[in-house]
């Protein structure tokens, strides 16, 4: 009777390997490669001359030739010491390390900017206002149609 009460159970494990899907990208050979610039509607027409721009130009601030980073090979004639208008701090810069020269250079630039705060910015630093010009151009377009 004991044989009858025993149940025979068996389990079977099946392992299925699932490979990740592979995506292959191929360039289309039908379309020729064209690199056209497409300007957005927010791009400004520079004084109606069909010159488009997206932002104000960068302003290059040249370094003084006495400062670190001047890589030119030519030699400059030293001005006589009596006519030198530079302060004693720039004469001592040659004896200082890179970090100290940089700190002094930055401080001179800040001082110069602070002293020149009353001067007006140049034309490259101010975005021109073309709103009146745009209105006139829109009126011309509407009158022509």
Swiss-Prot record:
UniProt entry tagged with the keyword Nucleus: yes
Family, similarity comment: Belongs to the YPI1 family.
Chain intervals with Low complexity compositional bias: 1-17
Biased composition (Basic residues): 102-113
Function: Regulator of type 1 phosphatases which maintains protein phosphatase activity under strict control.
Keywords, alphabetical: Nucleus
Cellular component annotations (GO), alphabetically ordered: nucleus; protein phosphatase type 1 complex
Protein species of origin: Vanderwaltozyma polyspora (strain ATCC 22028 / DSM 70294 / BCRC 21397 / CBS 2163 / NBRC 10782 / NRRL Y-8283 / UCD 57-17)
Top-level taxon: Eukaryota
Region (Disordered): 1-41, 64-145
Key word Nucleus present: yes
Record-level Gene Ontology MF annotations: protein phosphatase 1 binding; protein phosphatase activator activity; protein serine/threonine phosphatase inhibitor activity
Protein name: Type 1 phosphatases regulator YPI1
Amino acid composition bias (Basic and acidic residues), ranges on this chain: 27-39, 91-101
Listed GO biological process terms: glycogen metabolic process; intracellular monoatomic ion homeostasis; mitotic spindle assembly checkpoint signaling; regulation of protein localization to nucleus
Annotated localization: Nucleus
């Amino acid at each position: 009777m004991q044989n009858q009460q025993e149940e025979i159970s068996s389990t079977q494990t099946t392992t299925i390997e699932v490979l990740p899907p592979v995506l292959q990208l191929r360039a289309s050979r039908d379309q020729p490669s064209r690199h056209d610039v497409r300007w957005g509607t927010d791009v400004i027409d520079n004084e109606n001359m069909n010159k488009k721009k997206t932002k104000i130009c960068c302003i290059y601030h040249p370094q003084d030739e006495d400062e670190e980073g001047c890589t030119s090979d030519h030699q400059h004639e030293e001005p006589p010491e009596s006519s030198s208008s530079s302060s004693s701090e720039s004469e001592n810069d040659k004896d200082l390390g890179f970090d100290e020269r940089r700190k002094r250079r930055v401080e001179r630039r800040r001082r110069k900017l602070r002293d020149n705060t009353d001067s007006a910015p140049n034309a490259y630093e101010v975005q021109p206002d073309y709103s009146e010009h745009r209105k006139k151009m829109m009126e011309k377009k509407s009158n022509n149609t």
